[in-house]
Amino acid sequence: MELLYENSLYKLKIKNENVTIILADDILRNSLVNKMFLSGINVIALSNKLYTNNLRDELKRLDLNDEVVKTLNCDRIIDTDFKSLSMQDLAYVHIIIGLSKLPKVILLYDILTYLKKDDKDKVIEFLKQRNITIINFTSCEEEFLYCENMIIIDGNKVIMEGLTKEVLKNEKVIRRLGFNLPFVVDLSTQLKLYGVLDKYYYDTEELVVVLCKKVD
């Protein structure tokens, strides 16, 4: 089946039924949910009703396996009453439910921003290990590095697109659009400008190792 969603910003065409879309935006959810349900595409939003008391019971109700829970080490929330969870953990619950459907493609719409950094990193690592295609709509600079390719949209125009590492080299354009560079990219850019580094870095641990060697 093929789903076509179009608004003033972009046109999204999905041909694969094994797709999960996780949204923080209820308005977008309401405009998509009926069409996607008929297309066999899973739509999950923060407003989705949870019919049980905790994540373990919800996964059983949905007849989903607990592979994702075990892989992501979700012991701290697996049996916690939903009513006791923070907004961050509730967002994590919805993402875990979406991942437990083991989609081939997952579209994340402003949802990763809700997560704690450790949880966010675990989700991305899981997706990459399972070779699940990630489409992440975000305005959070630190999330730019999660995907190999990047598209910057302003109004109804595509400003830049290409490999993320190449797009991020256009610092002036990115800042003009109101964004900052991810911290590690910004720091390595400044250090390169002053001759401390000879290239850009996109991984914090790698940059720390290089800087420690220079200090030694």
Regions found by a protein language model. Give the residues of each.
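Conserved ABC nucleotide-binding domain
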Residues: 66-87, 102
